[in-house]
Amino acid sequence: MKVFEFLKGKRGAMGIGTLIIFIAMVLVAAVAAAVLINTSGFLQQKAMATGKESTEQVASGLSTLQVIGIHDNKAINYLAIYITPNAGSAAIDLNQTKILITDGEKKAVLRYNSNAYADLTTGGEVTNTSLAAWNLSGGEFGIIVLQDADGSCKSTTPVINKGDIVALTINASAVGLNLVPRTTVTGSVIPEFGAPAVIEFTTPAAYLSTQEVIQLQ
């Protein structure tokens, strides 16, 4: 009888032990599942953020619409580079944008001067060199706003986005560029991220006194 009771108690103890082990396994599995779910969610968000950044990096950038020059019959003294954001581009801060330009001898890196700004969205003459946007020294470029539906491109916060068009102004003489006839000019407008706008043209064989403003690109 005592042996039977002993065996019965032993089986009961084994049953309780098995139950404890089972509960412990369930708890461990639950914790592991929670960790996996959290990790999976984090990685998914990280992947989505990285994908968005990559898409913006690929789609974003600037395009050159045209380049015009203003000459004095001997050399081009002023340049205006018309740019717009690429289709699908994120907003671009021109404060963080640089212009690299060379005439084959002089190489210059230009940064935006917030005092050299003009808004011609309601009309005006880009080539009017009395505009503040043309008041530049070496190492600087200015901005003339031509199209800006949401008013995002201000003198101190020059941000351009979809549909905006601006002319970046350069005082070629102040920079030290010698833009006499038959000069090959190359360069780029480099935003903080995305594709740069390309500058590439050769000045005409001669400058006509009857045509002070010429299209170069």
Curated annotation (Swiss-Prot):
Residue ranges listed under propeptide: 1-12
GO cellular component: archaeal-type flagellum
Superkingdom to which the source organism belongs: Archaea
InterPro entries: Flagellin/pilin_N_arc (IPR013373), Flagellin_arc (IPR002774)
One Pfam family from the record: Arch_flagellin
Signal peptide region: none
GO BP terms in the entry: archaeal or bacterial-type flagellum-dependent cell motility
Annotated GO MF terms: structural molecule activity
Keyword Disulfide bond: no
Chief site of localization: other
Protein family (similarity comment): Belongs to the archaeal flagellin family.
Function field: Flagellin is the subunit protein which polymerizes to form the filaments of archaeal flagella.
Protein name according to UniProt: Flagellin B2
Record lineage: Archaea, Methanobacteriati, Methanobacteriota, Methanomada group, Methanococci
Gene assigned in the entry: flaB2
